[in-house]
Amino acid sequence: MATMLNKRVTGAFGKQAPVRSARVAAVRPSRSSVRVAATAAPQEVEGFKVMRDGIKVASDETLLTPRFYTTDFDEMERLFSLELNKNMDMEEFEAMLNEFKLDYNQRHFVRNETFKEAAEKIQGPTRKIFIEFLERSCTAEFSGFLLYKELGRRLKATNPVVAEIFTLMSRDEARHAGFLNKAMSDFNLALDLGFLTKNRKYTFFKPKFIFYATYLSEKIGYWRYISIYRHLQRNPDNQLYPLFEYFENWCQDENRHGDFFTAVLKARPEMVNDWAAKLWSRFFCLSVYITMYLNDHQRDAFYSSLGLNTTQFNQHVIIETNKSTERIFPAVPDVENPEFFRRMDLLVKYNAQLVNIGSMNLPSPIKAIMKAPILERMVAEVFQVFIMTPKESGSYDLDANKTALVY
């Protein structure tokens, strides 16, 4: 949930050398001086609220913003325990671990002097939407870092191979989040990721649902990044900022992470081989697709600044992600049915109406009354999309004792 779960910041504090005690005359500032110092700090930078100099207040959490995730770590330990799951096929995990250790992108995320210069040329409304894009992307990557890091720590004793893979994936996510946060500083802002860690709400998902959500997040992240990269290679005049030049190698991290979760689901076939799995697979696909579709159309100006058609871009990403997903999920939405995107476009229309009402200078109760019938129509459309005839899928033969790929 690439996109949505989470890429990284670490802090190291050196041990202080012993210092002899000394008597120092403490000077207590007057109340007036404290008041002056407090008001001297800017309350806004680039049109965004700041919590302190250069540090942006995180955007409000909504249904469409990136989330931080947590899970039942004890159940995770049981699912991957080699002692409890003696028949677990570790060959594919071991091969993946060796690939993660190669760290293909170790030297990829190196900035150059063009970043700051390019950021200074981006002005007006485009500048603000670039900052919003960087914040959402950084938050999503950092979310993944936090989850993967904790899984790596918790699984060390029960399954060292899988634990190390999670740790190495958290390494990737940390690089991505750090790179994006540094990009924000080109626009005179940054996120306090340590503050977010402690203060942001965490959404709980059972392990099975974590696997669904993170698989989709990583795969949709891959298709988003590679699609933007290829578009800008064909249209270099729209390359407003050098960040996008890194997307070709960057997206391979996302793809490898998604492939790891494919291996996880193959190792736990009970998660993808019954009627409940079919319903949950479709639910998570729709949740991810609808969230992206509404989010991106709400920020159409960003994609337009890159020369992209937001609708065409989103539909391409969803179709390609769905093709990848149907290889392992037992059922997926039929996104190539024209009715699917017709209803998605209706959701975009209704969401725009909600945003418009939200911006009105009216009392909250009045806004709630105005929003109610629109929300009702949105729920009805989502339900209609969910009950559309799905594509029965899953090209892997998932046997309880042996997993084999069907050609």
From Swiss-Prot:
Question: Which Gene Ontology terms cover its molecular function?
Answer: magnesium-protoporphyrin IX monomethyl ester (oxidative) cyclase activity; metal ion binding
Key words, A-Z: Chlorophyll biosynthesis, Chloroplast, Iron, Metal-binding, NADP, Oxidoreductase, Photosynthesis, Plastid, Transit peptide
Show the GO cellular component annotation of the record.
chloroplast
Is the keyword Oxidoreductase assigned to this protein? yes
Record's catalysed reaction(s): Mg-protoporphyrin IX 13-monomethyl ester + 3 NADPH + 3 O2 + 2 H(+) = 3,8-divinyl protochlorophyllide a + 3 NADP(+) + 5 H2O
Enzyme Commission numbers on file? 1.14.13.81
Q: What is the organism of origin for this protein?
A: Chlamydomonas reinhardtii (Chlamydomonas smithii)
Q: What class of enzyme is it?
A: oxidoreductase
- Protein function: Catalyzes the formation of the isocyclic ring in chlorophyll biosynthesis. Mediates the cyclase reaction, which results in the formation of divinylprotochlorophyllide (Pchlide) characteristic of all chlorophylls from magnesium-protoporphyrin IX 13-monomethyl ester (MgPMME).
Q: What induces it?
A: By Copper and oxygen.
Cited SUPFAM superfamilies:
Ferritin-like
Q: Which Pfam families match?
A: Rubrerythrin
Q: Which GO terms describe its biological process?
A: chlorophyll biosynthetic process; photosynthesis
Name the protein family: Belongs to the AcsF family.
Indicate whether RNA-binding appears among the record's keywords: no
What this protein needs as a cofactor is:
Fe cation
Annotated pathway: Porphyrin-containing compound metabolism; chlorophyll biosynthesis
What is the official name of this protein in its record? Magnesium-protoporphyrin IX monomethyl ester [oxidative] cyclase 2, chloroplastic
Compartments, record wording? Plastid, Chloroplast
